[in-house]
């Protein structure tokens, strides 16, 4: 039993390093689905493949005349003639016709394009530009035609690699040429007719879009693989220098082919292949996760974490990969789409359950189980888990968010009537009793609309009640404010009156005192005057 609890490519130098803890996350319903290597690609160069459509057959002592080859040659000519004519119309417009246009000095037959978009016109320009290389490769048609090898590499004048492929030559070399002198001509002709007929069927399927317009309908590498047959890996490895397998590159659709020339006399076809440049970031993993519901705090919840995470060393980012091409083991992107994660999210990914956030689920929810490497991870508190072999119900304790069911506990499992065969052992070596606080559960995406509407209505009624109380308080405050203003005004007026009265009294006191002083002086003068008069009389 292999334990794989943590994914961390870098070495944890510091104690605070954070890695994706697969084991803990699985116990709360966050299950790892796929781990892919991150690679970057760009279209940088082109290569050419010369497909030799008619095999070489060694002469025999019986001087057999193979009618199947003659018929195959005729049928193939009818198939390729429209393609050759179409390419000729695009690359060589009639000198007397004005229906052509120049792009960067290149003449293109507009009539051959028909109604074309900008991308299709660009493809036509590429088709015309490829003619120089195609003619250089076609100049070696004699050496290509004479070879009896299934794959034949040549170098043309611009030092671009050209691979001559004879798609059915491998079958002819290994099976038929060894039996030419030991079997009758009729039997050999029948065998050859069968092989050529099957191959012709493939050609018809592959080149059906190109019968309309090769400039507007590029050959996908998947169709080209059918055309090249068993030689596809050799061709891919010769044109693309990388350690990634040919199957990964082809399935990602990173290579496309376009017919640039057809040589009917030699039954040769030159296909231009756009070869990408691929760079792999060795320490970068893109991990896909699948979330199922879990039983937390006596209710069904689901963890709030991204579906895809990029891990480089001990750092994690959210990675949407919206413009990337995914295969089984690789993810090919033209640029890095990483988005920062919050510290709480990083801690949650590292297995710190106290930092995780869950959203409650109301109503029916279908994502309650997932198949994982031959085992089943299910929320057996929200659906019925019944083991049929041996027969017993599976109970999930309150302290378990989900239940992992492997071969040791059950061989045939029924989940709400769906039967599954368990074929593997779980790689989890331990399980924890989870403790999650109520504050970690939020309501982000309610499903039971009627319940939520009832809550909204209740909230509105409470709001109306509070508004009425508020209005009453405002009215009370308004009346009180008026009374208070009157009292304040009266107090101010009273104070002013008192001040004025005091000032008046003070002024009256001063005036009275001054009058008394004047009267005293007058009386004193009168007394002196009387004394003087008496003295004079005496």
Curated annotation (Swiss-Prot):
Protein name per UniProt: Fusion glycoprotein F0
Record PTM text: The inactive precursor F0 is glycosylated and proteolytically cleaved into F1 and F2 to be functionally active. The cleavage is mediated by cellular proteases including host FURIN during the transport and maturation of the polypeptide.
Region feature (Fusion peptide): 103-127
Residues glycosylated per entry: 56, 73, 89, 182, 352, 427, 433, 457
InterPro entries: Fusion_F0_Paramyxovir
Topological category with respect to the lipid bilayer: Single-pass type I membrane protein; Single-pass membrane protein
Residues annotated as signal peptide: 1-19
Pfam families: Fusion_gly
Family: Belongs to the paramyxoviruses fusion glycoprotein family.
Gene: F
Compartment annotation: Virion membrane; Host cell membrane
Disulfide pairings: 324-333, 380-385, 387-410
Keywords: Cleavage on pair of basic residues, Coiled coil, Disulfide bond, Fusion of virus membrane with host cell membrane, Fusion of virus membrane with host membrane, Glycoprotein, Host cell membrane, Host membrane, Membrane, Signal, Transmembrane, Transmembrane helix, Viral envelope protein, Viral penetration into host cytoplasm, Virion, Virus entry into host cell
Subunit structure: Homotrimer; disulfide-linked F1-F2. Interacts with host LAMP1; LAMP2 and LAMP3; these interactions promote the cleavage of the viral fusion protein F.
Superkingdom field: Viruses
